[in-house]
């Protein structure tokens, strides 16, 4: 009958509306879940970026602190060596005056140094360079000489051990005072060593004073070798 047909049509419309409503609810739920997942992903990305930025800042702060510590140690050593250099000049002048030399400074040996890491090769020269660790430009006050870790490091000249031990960013270090050489007070330092073989007293030219390593602020096995004249660094090439 017409009434039954009308009722059936209403039922179909109701079921269709219900199904569409359920589908709309499911779609809304899926959209909420997708939005929640997207927000979680964005939150995670933001947290990761914040953590990475903090890590970079911490690394930069650490590098600046290491640089400051190494500069302070360099300044301290320079002051010590300048004081020793002045004492050596006074002693040489007094000795020359006593010998009737009119106060001149004597020549101390031939002045040429042995290669401090036999068989090693230079990987970084004295002077301006970009630091291989932090990529920042600066001044390199010595020669970097490379060889496999564990190779012997020798005294470039005979001298007196000024200091031996850990020296912050310089790693395990030995500093030698060679007195007057070629008319000027000379000292040398040997840095980043794996281990040290002398702790005080006198050493002879060519004597093993330690073994090459990569201690301190270093990016690989090498010897950082410095030559000091009158307490300040000079290019070791002029002495080797």
PLM regions: where:
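Alpha-helical oligomerization segments with coiled-coil/rod-like character
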Residues: 1-106
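Catalytic cores of peptidoglycan-degrading enzymes
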Residues: 107-240
